[in-house]
Amino acid sequence: MTIALGKFTKDEKDLFDIMDDWLRRDRFVFVGWSGLLLFPCAYFALGGWFTGTTFVTSWYTHGLASSYLEGCNFLTAAVSTPANSLAHSLLLLWGPEAQGDFTRWCQLGGLWAFVALHGALALIGFMLRQFELARSVQLRPYNAIAFSGPIAVFVSVFLIYPLGQSGWFFAPSFGVAAIFRFILFFQGFHNWTLNPFHMMGVAGVLGAALLCAIHGATVENTLFEDGDGANTFRAFNPTQAEETYSMVTANRFWSQIFGVAFSNKRWLHFFMLFVPVTGLWMSALGVVGLALNLRAYDFVSQEIRAAEDPEFETFYTKNILLNEGIRAWMAAQDQPHENLIFPEEVLPRGNAL
């Protein structure tokens, strides 16, 4: 018996090969297999958001006006979450809630579920697009890995957090002022600013901004004067083989400033990747914790002493009182279906009052 080893070649292309050739063809806008997920989902998510902010009211879900048609502007318009009574319903247009009635579906908050789902899939499609292109041109996949940070934050905030609560109602609505309201809600009900995962997220994002500013300024400061152009952009050939700036000079400069400096470009750029992505992932993990109602840092001894001693108060105890005020105000305003009424004597008062 003879076994022949070799590369198998097909005589003619099948449907998959034809599709692969067309999708991955070199064109102005790359499509790829990832584009089958990215482009339709991005189109539907953006289209749903523009439709909702232009025409759809939030009167039936939040008791609010939220569209341009009702007088809102870009900062106050939003696609609002479904009512709390709908819990975690997928709110399909053909489902038992809307029963195929598009107007009723919009009034119930179906557009929010539509935008959230397609938005998440579009972000995942964009990450897969970066994977696919990187593989095609034989690059490492670090762009896609970095983009996992924003995806983790989006999925944790818009999907996982409300899944841990009583319904989609407690997710952020898709609008600028609506997300500001959600941030205040997070602070009042979860003391989010004192959560260690939020602290790591802030350190990551602001640290990344600092690293970008330092890196950009350092590169500009140490450019080689190779060209005759009057500015940076005309001085160099985009296909040049030589270095654009002096890493050695930059290293000497920061060694004198801080006493330490990055010794090579690989470590420097990996650190610039690591800091923001880790910060975003930590924030996402923190939000998953909030979905389970895990608490932030509590300094109970300070709260007890502040309650017993009228002259003792810290910034922490003042913030706790502020959180109580946010809860007392937002619970009644934000959940009108609960008919909550708080008499004045139960509202929080600081020792200074």
Swiss-Prot record:
Chlorophyll a ChlzD2 binds at H118. GO terms for molecular function: chlorophyll binding; electron transporter, transferring electrons within the cyclic electron transport pathway of photosynthesis activity; iron ion binding; oxygen evolving activity. Fe cation binds at H215, H269. The gene is psbD. Keywords: Acetylation, Chlorophyll, Chloroplast, Chromophore, Electron transport, Iron, Magnesium, Membrane, Metal-binding, Oxidoreductase, Phosphoprotein, Photosynthesis, Photosystem II, Plastid, Thylakoid, Transmembrane, Transmembrane helix, Transport. It catalyses: 2 a plastoquinone + 4 hnu + 2 H2O = 2 a plastoquinol + O2. Disulfide bonds: none annotated. Pfam families: Photo_RC. Its EC number is 1.10.3.9. GO terms for biological process: photosynthetic electron transport in photosystem II. This is Photosystem II D2 protein. It is a multi-pass membrane protein. Photosystem II (PSII) is a light-driven water:plastoquinone oxidoreductase that uses light energy to abstract electrons from H(2)O, generating O(2) and a proton gradient subsequently used for ATP formation. It consists of a core antenna complex that captures photons, and an electron transfer chain that converts photonic excitation into a charge separation. The D1/D2 (PsbA/PsbD) reaction center heterodimer binds P680, the primary electron donor of PSII as well as several subsequent electron acceptors. D2 is needed for assembly of a stable PSII complex. PSII is composed of 1 copy each of membrane proteins PsbA, PsbB, PsbC, PsbD, PsbE, PsbF, PsbH, PsbI, PsbJ, PsbK, PsbL, PsbM, PsbT, PsbX, PsbY, PsbZ, Psb30/Ycf12, at least 3 peripheral proteins of the oxygen-evolving complex and a large number of cofactors. It forms dimeric complexes. The D1/D2 heterodimer binds P680, chlorophylls that are the primary electron donor of PSII, and subsequent electron acceptors. It shares a non-heme iron and each subunit binds pheophytin, quinone, additional chlorophylls, carotenoids and lipids. There is also a Cl(-1) ion associated with D1 and D2, which is required for oxygen evolution. The PSII complex binds additional chlorophylls, carotenoids and specific lipids. The modification Phosphothreonine is found at T2. It comes from Lobularia maritima (Sweet alyssum). Pheophytin a binds at Q130, N143. The chain crosses the membrane at residues 41-61, 125-141, 153-166, 208-228, 279-295. One of its GO terms (cellular component) is chloroplast thylakoid membrane. Chlorophyll a PD2 binds at H198. Belongs to the reaction center PufL/M/PsbA/D family. It is found in: Plastid, Chloroplast thylakoid membrane. The modification N-acetylthreonine is found at T2. 2 of the reaction center chlorophylls (ChlD1 and ChlD2) are entirely coordinated by water. A plastoquinone binds at H215, F262.
